[in-house]
Amino acid sequence: MSDIALTVSVLALVAVVGLWIGNIKVRGVGFGIGGVLFGGIIVGHFVDQAGVTLSGDMLHFIQEFGLILFVYTIGIQVGPGFFASLRVSGLRLNLFAVLIVIMGGLVTAILHKIFAIPLPVVLGIFSGAVTNTPALGAGQQILRDLGTPVDLVDQMGMSYAMAYPFGICGILLTMWLMRLIFRVNVEAEAQKHESSLANGHSLIQTMNIRVENPNLNNMAIQDVPILNSDKIICSRLKRDDTLMVPSPGTIIQAGDLLHLVGQPTDLHNAQLVIGKEVDTSLSTRGTDLRVERVVITNEKVLGKRIRDLHFKERYDVVISRLNRAGVELVASSDASLQFGDILNLVGRPASIDAVANVVGNAQQKLQQVQMLPVFIGIGLGVLLGSIPLFVPGFPVALKLGLAGGPLIMALILGRIGSIGKLYWFMPPSANLALRELGIVLFLAVVGLKSGGDFVDTLTQGEGLSWIGYGIFITAIPLITVGLLARIFAKMNYLTLCGMLAGSMTDPPALAFANNLHATSGAAVLSYATVYPLVMFLRIITPQLLAVIFWGMG
């Protein structure tokens, strides 16, 4: 058997063993995809014992390409929400999550200086303690750029594996500890979260209002400031028994019923100006109007603003809502359309069909993957990661590397959405498949390289010490920030658990947090809010630590 065939066969065996290990769960918690690392260690141990030689160049390529695939697909997935998560609504959550990352880096630095832990080892412990595989790849990349011998770089994977198990268990223990210390009633916390959502600005709602303000009688909708803003959409108007789709030039009369869409505060302000909220139904049932959802799949409308498409003037159709990446938004006239956006339309059947033809509404297109943008994005990301940044006082030029470059490029492209006929939307199933393939390839190679010396290091070397260092890196930031968030910020317990899981980019921890309450979405919401920024910082942190310590030592 050739070296290439043998290497591929061994990698396939590692994936099978590792994924089987990852599927083993104790009380609902398992290693998940991290099991591939331990599958690689097991197979690597026996491969080393048998004296089998694998293709080193091929293993190196597979490891790096797997990492690129993983971080790129993460960036495409979270890109649309990344910059939004940095705004005020998620600012507090992100600040606490960033504090966890910073404290983890500080604890790592202190352990490195006090116990003189070799740089590759301490970076591996850090990556394993925070259960972040891209951090491992980024650390190995910068160490190679700094000229670290290959055998020392491979130690990083071994120390990562030592610290990884408590990295997963530590966050679960922290959640349990917070619940114990503060005597949390999970049901009460879930109700508080639902109440805060209902009173906040995060949900798009509707309101039916009767026109009672005499100053509005015989005025056009476009002349009423609250109705001519991008905060409120008037999607239906009922006069006597006639339901119609209003246009900006529609004249309002006293007694008209308006169906408005917007955020709760804006709807309340509109009600104060216009008249009284009523329970009268403005349903399209039994009328010649209907409400339908259509999806943007036509490349010709990508990047165009809603106002430029003139749907109301041309087709007598109103867009009442816009759903992007699962988030309901008011259909602002300045909003630019992206591939996969879902529009809520109100109008006559023939008119809605005409608009659907314009925007595409081809469901099968949502399941297709444009491979050209994928490789353009990966290529640009690798180029970005290879650009040297010379900083005075540092021994080598800083680079984003093969982990940071594709991630940042994917975040940017995911946020842009499309350029001309190229769009960076990727079906969730395709994104997940590429992401899982990438991380399996990466972890399989890391495990194989670490497996030969793993048992000796654990039983006769410093493996137990590495585990102890990892416990400090995991526990100190999580417990400290958990206490601060609960005591001083009065953070909801379920929101806190999601934030802690997101700060460690740990899906098993998110699954555990979700199981705390069957119906509350608090944990998922906070996890998704902090995940993009934290993933970026987790990849950058080991590179900064490596360059700083290399310069000092």
Curated annotation (Swiss-Prot):
Q: Give any Pfam family that matches.
A: Asp-Al_Ex
Q: What Gene Ontology molecular function terms does this protein carry?
A: monoatomic cation transmembrane transporter activity
Q: How does the entry describe its membrane topology? A: Multi-pass membrane protein
Q: Does the keyword Repeat apply?
A: yes
* One annotated Gene Ontology cellular component of this protein: plasma membrane
Enumerate the PANTHER family for this protein: K(+)_H(+) ANTIPORTER SUBUNIT KHTT (PTHR30445), TRANSPORT PROTEIN YIDE-RELATED (PTHR30445:SF3)
Q: What is this protein called?
A: Putative transport protein YidE
Q: Which organism is it from?
A: Salmonella typhi
Instruction: Supply the gene name.
Output: yidE
